[in-house]
Amino acid sequence: MSVILSNRLYLPYSPQLAEKIKAELTYTIPARRRGARPTVFKDFFKIRDTLSIPIGRQDFIPEGSELIDKRVDIPADIPEILYTLRPSQQEAVNLINDNYVINAIPGYGKTVTALALVSKLKQKTLIIVHTVALRDQWIREVQKILGIEPGIIGSGKYETDKDIVIANIQSLYKHSDDLKSKFGMVVTDECHHAPARTFKEVLDKLKSRYKLGLSGTLIRKDGRHVYMLDYITPFDIYVPQEENILKPEIVIFPTDFPISDSGLIPWANKITALTSIPNYNIIIKRIAEAEAKKGHKVLCVSDRIQFLEALGEGIANSLVVTGMYKERSDLERRLSDDIDIIFGSISIFKEGISLNALSCLILATPINNDAMLTQLIGRIQRKHEGKLNPIVIDLQYKGKTAKRQQASRLNLYYSKEYKIHTLNND
């Protein structure tokens, strides 16, 4: 019995194996709206007398099978890293010799660990990211950590001749057929995006011998995390012990601002109503300025651009970041010099911009997503010389919906063993 390993696994058909695969690779994703039907996703199909399943599900290979490995192995002259790894990073590099996922909170150093693995395995490598900001950040890290220039796919460039190529997924998608056999290793940054159609289809075409996923959270609010690792491996996941990070203190800030409990009003409209209250704007500004005066470097986040722009008005030592910022190094310099407060969009700061000096996170609009909240808190947990112990300002609102969301966030804080205290604003 022969099993082919390529972009996917190709196994000889048998009714018993087909039933087992159907049972395990049929995923029911609960509906997010009340009354809506769940989504059923199947990631297997039959081609004549062959069953095709994702490459990560090698647990379905029958014992005693002959393995025919058609994955591509493309040796490359990757230099040693110009960096000293911390113990848990070195542990990951020593451990990983095959498809793997590194699940570590922001501050661990997933980028340098991944590049150390690229150096170890010495394969022509494709690094996949989902934003231009992340792509540019990886370019700088490859230059700094390995001392070489990577190729770029995106922004009008299609440079596939370099030993390391960095591509944003939107540009990669249209070239996936051409690229499927050109890389011996693929690194997927923020691999929890893999269930997205473009990510999934690209990963499913690549025949790379080694696949490495990086993530700060393996949970998705939409429930699709149940199958996302099938394209890399759902079994070999490295979760390092927490090091090089600071545990934040959670400050619950009670307010009298209401959030409607009406099921007829869309959530987006409820948040728009909240951020349109003039006094709410004033309170957020005062909190940010007060924490900055204590010596904190403040990150105040929301998903409302106009709200963030309004918050930044009249505060001399602040900066509004709601889109791609030209250079992370410039942001770091300004935080050291003249900027104490950043009013930033959640979409930008949950992934992609890491500024070690940040020490205070203000949740300027409520968050009901544990994965997103974990990512945002990670932005203030990195160690940095002269940095105050990090704090999270979590505003408390009136209403049953607000209380349920607050309880969900508290559960996350307790699970992380964060110190929590509530201000008395009487």
Question: Which stretches of residues belong to each language-model region?
Answer:
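Conserved RecA-like P-loop NTPase helicase motor core
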Residues: 173, 323-416
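Conserved pre-motif I regulatory segment
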Residues: 67-103
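Interdomain "pre-motor" coupling segment immediately N-terminal to P-loop NTPase/helicase cores
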Residues: 22-71
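Walker A/P-loop
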Residues: 98-121, 126
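Conserved helicase ATPase core of P-loop NTP-dependent helicases/translocases
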Residues: 136, 140, 149-161, 174, ...
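Conserved interdomain hinge at the start of the Helicase C-terminal
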Residues: 118, 262-303, 309-313
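Conserved helix/coil segment N-terminal to the catalytic DExD/H
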Residues: 155-185, 196-201, 348
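Post-DEXD/H (motif II) to motif III coupling segment of the RecA-like Helicase ATP-binding lobe
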Residues: 184-185, 192-249, 413
